Design a protein with these regions (language model features):
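Domain-core detector
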Residues: 1-121, 127-149
Length: 149
């Protein structure tokens, strides 16, 4: 019995147990959100409205993250659409329980998306960038879809 419990909590045969999995998830999420809060403060202070979504796509990456990583650049005005599953010209499935893209923290809003990003255990980062670094074709596309302020 003790061995079964140990395996479930800590892990066995090279697989993490529940305690280890959750500890890693909370640690990864906290560190990345801390970094994201700093990036948001910088972008707010500098008045930057364009962002680049960066990071590695993994087997566990969510559909939202895959699509936004492929899109690469986004404008602050697009965030509201992200929360309803609209990323560029693609539509992402929404969770029935939260009404947000799968994996998103249920408290995600337009105001905190830059910090919470793709949700629990999201390893992607959002970096503010100057308008001049965004390709004109991307700017035109966003202008046509959501308008720019």
């Amino acid at each position: 019995m003790a061995e079964i419990l140990r395996g479930t909590i800590i892990g066995k045969d090279g697989e993490d147990g529940a305690l280890v999995k959750y500890a890693k998830t909370y640690a990864t999420t906290a560190i990345n959100q801390f970094n994201a809060q700093y990036n948001k403060s910088v972008s707010d202070d500098l008045g930057l409205n364009w962002y680049q979504y960066t990071g590695t796509i993994r087997k566990t990456s969510r559909e939202f993250c895959k699509v936004l990583k492929e899109k690469k650049y986004f404008h602050r005005n697009e965030i509201e659409g992200f929360l309803t599953g609209h990323v560029g010209d693609k539509t992402i499935p929404l969770s029935q329980s939260t009404g947000l893209p799968y994996g998103f923290d249920e408290t995600t809003t337009v105001n905190n998306f830059i910090i919470l990003r793709g949700g629990w255990n999201c390893n992607h980062q959002i970096f503010p960038i100057m308008d001049s670094l965004v390709p004109d074709s991307v700017k035109r596309d966003v202008e046509m879809r959501v308008g720019l302020v």
